[in-house]
Amino acid sequence: MIPELKKTTEQKMQKSIDVLKADLAKVRTGRAHTGLLDHVMVEYYGSMVPISQVSNVTLIDARTIGVQVWEKPMMQKVERAIRDSDLGLNPANQGDIIRVPMPALTEERRRDLTKVVRHEGEAAKVAIRNLRRDANQHLKDAVKDKTISEDDDRRAQEDIQKLTDRNIAEIDKLLAQKEQELMQL
């Protein structure tokens, strides 16, 4: 019972970190990267699909993303979807490719984005702690039902605490990297 509990708790904690990584990838820094447009959806024959399913998204240079749409009629829809996204980007249609220049971030915007990053990180830490609490509750219930001994309970709680500490440290590292990336000019 205890090994399965540890394994499922570890998997759930890893999923929380994966969600944080995905959320942090959406936060725009001054540099261009293709993952920035991953969550932008465009209407394609009546259904909403990610831009990557109707075009090639590439880097032209460090501050410009290129979007090469496969079907000409979709150019304006893709351009509008990028413009209407919450990223604050202004795409330019150049016939066969849509250029998406990355505007420089102001100091105020950088601070706002840093707050957003910290908030996302705190939410991930809360999720990790909640998973620890749930695992510890399962252990307490097992002790009460006399399925495991109190010594096993204590050892398992220590292991889960180590797992929690390791994941919290990884979250802190991810946040520090993203904040440093945001504050670079």
From Swiss-Prot:
InterPro entries linked: Ribosome_recyc_fac (IPR002661), Ribosome_recyc_fac_dom (IPR023584), RRF_sf (IPR036191)
CDD domains recorded: RRF
GO annotations of cellular component type: cytosol
Subcellular location: Cytoplasm
GO molecular function, one term: ribosomal large subunit binding
Pfam families: RRF
One GO-annotated biological process of the protein: cytoplasmic translational termination
Chief localisation class: cytoplasm
This protein's UniProt keywords: Cytoplasm, Protein biosynthesis
Keyword Amino-acid biosynthesis found: no
Job of this protein: Responsible for the release of ribosomes from messenger RNA at the termination of protein biosynthesis. May increase the efficiency of translation by recycling ribosomes from one round of translation to another.
Family: Belongs to the RRF family.
Protein name per its UniProtKB record: Ribosome-recycling factor
Gene name of this polypeptide: frr
